[in-house]
Amino acid sequence: MKLNELYNNIGAKKNKKRIARGIGSGKGKTGGRGIKGQKSRSGVAIKGFEGGQTPMIKRLPKRGFNCISTKKYNIINIYNIEEALADGRLSADDNITKEKLVEARVVNNKNNKKLVKLLSICSDDFAAPLSLKLDAYSAKAKDLIEKAGGKLL
């Protein structure tokens, strides 16, 4: 036996039935779609329809709630401000505001839509006395800034 003499067993490989290719093909004319109606036309699928059984969307209970007035915060940490001060992107003499943080690329805040909250994760000491004007602060961040001689405007 050689490679060029190999072949499939009879019936092992079956050609698929080509539908809607003439009446003589056995699957012609309507091509298995029935007669007339929305589902016989091309490009139509009834979204969420499961053949008459109660759809999944109706079987599952309603759950949850999206509060419209939820405040979305851009979260920064004290060490982010320390890095910007070390790089020279921020000045310790100025009032640090949301706009200055955007300019210094500490916060990515398109059109100033989000609020900015300062946290103190990974920071246990803070040396520079800064004056900050942000939207929110964690309790630990407030303590660290005030201990360093800074102000929250």
Curated annotation (Swiss-Prot):
An example molecular function term from Gene Ontology annotations: rRNA binding
A Pfam family hit: Ribosomal_L27A
Keywords: Ribonucleoprotein, Ribosomal protein, RNA-binding, rRNA-binding
Tree of life domain: Bacteria
Region (Disordered): 21-41
Subunit structure: Part of the 50S ribosomal subunit.
NCBIfam families recorded: rplO_bact
Protein's recorded name: Large ribosomal subunit protein uL15
Organism: Rickettsia rickettsii (strain Sheila Smith)
Gene name of the encoded protein: rplO
